[in-house]
């Protein structure tokens, strides 16, 4: 049986996550389950998209990901099931479904086609997405879950792309983790090992390979575990040190231009 990985904004203080696990067990008894993240800020599609991108390459082949951060629940937004390479995704069509790139197959999930009761207007993670994830985990045919959808018309991912500059890139802070590290949208492979990052006219961070290379409370630039460049302070918070927040710009330049 295919494993199911869960990414939601349901939190851990209510019954929501437990009930989703119960529904998965009901429709796919014994299904292996992976809790990726249930602490996405409520309705934060941007953060959910980033966390999904970070986790995706490390999931086992055949894995079914149920990603539900769904501020449009109960509206006419589509519920989707997608095949992406050797993995599957069930998610609302609000940018999450498009966050991983083109899919080979996309269907709009139809509860009637799956023999389900009409889903709740407020908890479709339980009534629609969890049964859909279980359907795929059992090895059932994705194309029998509903009507096919052209992947070109999906709601686009909210994460911005880096803006090329003559000597580097204008990057954007796209996530701040619990350590205060500031992840940008620029892959580490986009610039050389001597690159620098500037966020004001007189504040510049040099690139290093490890946190321990930072001197004291120095803000440094390094490639994070997901492959994106981030600003960090060894043993401290880059968010506090710089005052930067998600959505702010950082200029990341090649060796011949340190910014400023």
Protein language model annotation of sequence segments:
Residues 2-40:
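N-terminal glycine-rich anion-binding loop in soluble enzyme alpha/beta folds
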Residues 3, 27-33, 44-50, 60-69, ...:
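Active-site histidine-anchored catalytic micro-motif
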Residues 3-5, 31-34, 63-66, 79-81, ...:
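Structural motif
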Residues 8-10, 36-38, 68-71, 84-85, ...:
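Fold-independent oxyanion-binding glycine-rich loops
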Residues 116-185, 190:
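Anionic-ligand-binding alpha/beta catalytic cores of soluble enzymes and soluble regulatory domains
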Residues 183-243:
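A conserved acidic, glycine/proline-rich C-terminal tail/linker
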Residues 246-255:
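Surface-exposed interaction regions enriched in Ser/Thr/Asp/Glu
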């Amino acid at each position: 049986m295919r494993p199911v990985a869960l990414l939601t904004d349901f939190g851990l203080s209510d019954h929501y996550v437990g009930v989703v696990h119960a529904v998965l067990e009901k429709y796919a008894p014994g299904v292996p389950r992976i809790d990726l993240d249930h602490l996405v800020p409520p309705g934060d599609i941007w953060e959910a998209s980033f966390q999904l991108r970070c986790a995706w390459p490390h999931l086992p082949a055949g894995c079914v990901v149920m990603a539900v951060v769904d501020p449009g629940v109960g509206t006419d937004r589509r519920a989707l099931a997608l095949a992406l390479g050797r993995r599957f995704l069930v998610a609302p069509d609000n940018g999450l479904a498009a966050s991983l790139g083109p899919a080979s197959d996309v269907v709009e999930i139809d509860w009637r086609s799956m023999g389900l009761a009409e889903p709740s207007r407020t908890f479709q993670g339980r009534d629609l997405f969890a049964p859909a994830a279980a359907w795929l985990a059992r090895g059932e045919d994705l194309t029998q879950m509903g009507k096919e959808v052209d992947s070109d018309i999906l709601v686009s991912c909210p994460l911005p792309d880096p803006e090329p500059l003559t000597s580097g890139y204008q990057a954007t802070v796209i996530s701040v983790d619990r350590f205060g590290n500031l992840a940008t949208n620029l892959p580490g492979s986009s610039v050389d090992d001597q690159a620098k990052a500037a966020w004001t006219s007189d504040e510049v961070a040099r690139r290093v390979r490890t946190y321990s290379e930072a001197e004291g409370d120095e803000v440094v630039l390094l490639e994070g575990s997901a492959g994106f460049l981030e600003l960090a302070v060894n043993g401290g918070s880059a968010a506090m040190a710089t005052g930067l927040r998600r959505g702010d710009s950082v200029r990341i330049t090649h060796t011949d231009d340190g910014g400023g």
